[in-house]
């Protein structure tokens, strides 16, 4: 299990892991490379292709643990890491199943116009970094909810619903990372996990979608689900936004569906 875009493992993933563990499942939760307690440079850079390789390494690690059956390993991802998991699963024959929630499935659908408009600037930034310049950083979240509501925010996760997540993190004392490298956008702009959905079969997929998601395109998520072959299962969490499925009442509905999927898969 890894968190989503710019996320850290302590941001509610422990709640999912605890419920899985209570049901008898061993769980590995880790920060993506360059984030939190994980090593790697550059710091605060999202690179989906490298994160795919890290899932393969995570499988290698857990499959060697004495209490893990390597024939019963499931990849789990959320938001950006959901997309990472979908693409990783498409090419990894070793795993037994896939759970994704509110997955990022298409850069073209999600950030295509923005990335195209910024392409020249981003490639100049890439060249400057390779030449020894310091990396430019971009804000992940708006500074205020008023900024988000205005529609003028230049933050990457600029929807007002992000403040549901921010406020809950602050309430629980969970750390937030508020900046990513500008070159993150170059890494993300070619990421198209929906192109590989058909390759995941025959591994079972559970896709959990938040009905009112404004951060990750719900239309793209549902389209990607249609691309996937059986066996597959779709869970739509009604009246929930992108971040509400991490905690509270919507979390309970979400985790119930995930545990039922695992029970059907292994028991």
Features from the language model and the residues they span:
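Short beta-strand/loop motif that positions the catalytic acidic residue
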Residues: 200-201, 207-209
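Conserved alpha/beta-hydrolase "acid-adjacent" motif
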Residues: 214-220
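Alpha/beta-hydrolase-fold enzymes
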Residues: 86-168
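Catalytic active-site module of serine/aspartate enzymes centered on a nucleophile-bearing elbow/loop
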Residues: 238-267
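Catalytic nucleophile-loop/oxyanion-hole region of alpha/beta-hydrolase
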Residues: 8-9, 35-74, 249-254
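The serine-hydrolase catalytic nucleophile loop
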Residues: 5-18, 32, 219
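Conserved alpha/beta-hydrolase
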Residues: 19-40
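Glycine-rich nucleophile elbow surrounding the catalytic serine of serine-hydrolase chemistry
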Residues: 77-87
């Amino acid at each position: 299990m890894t968190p989503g875009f710019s996320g850290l493992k302590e941001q509610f993933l422990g709640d999912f892991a605890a419920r899985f563990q209570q049901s008898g499942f061993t769980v590995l939760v880790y920060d993506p490379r360059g984030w939190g307690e994980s090593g790697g440079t550059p710091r605060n850079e999202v690179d989906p292709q490298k994160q795919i390789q890290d899932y393969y390494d995570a499988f290698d690690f857990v499959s060697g643990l004495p209490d893990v059956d390597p024939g019963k390993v499931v990849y789990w991802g959320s938001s950006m890491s959901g997309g990472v998991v979908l693409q990783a699963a498409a090419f990894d024959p070793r795993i037994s199943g896939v759970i994704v929630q509110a997955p990022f499935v298409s850069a073209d659908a999600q950030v295509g116009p923005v990335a195209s408009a910024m392409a020249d600037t981003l490639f100049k930034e890439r060249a400057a970094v390779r030449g020894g310049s310091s990396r430019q950083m971009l804000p992940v979240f708006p500074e205020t909810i008023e900024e988000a509501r205005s529609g003028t925010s230049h933050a990457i996760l600029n929807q007002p619903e992000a403040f549901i997540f921010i406020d809950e993190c602050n309430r629980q004392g969970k750390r937030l990372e508020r900046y990513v490298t500008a070159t993150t956008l170059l890494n993300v702009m070619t990421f198209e996990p929906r192109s590989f959905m058909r390759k995941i079969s025959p591994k079972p997929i559970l896709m959990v979608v938040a009905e009112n998601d404004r951060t990750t395109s719900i239309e793209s998520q549902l389209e990607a689900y249609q691309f996937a072959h059986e066996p597959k299962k779709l869970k739509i969490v009604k009246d929930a936004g992108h971040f509400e499925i991490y905690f509270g009442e919507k979390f309970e509905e979400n985790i119930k569906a995930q545990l039922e999927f695992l029970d059907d898969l292994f028991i």
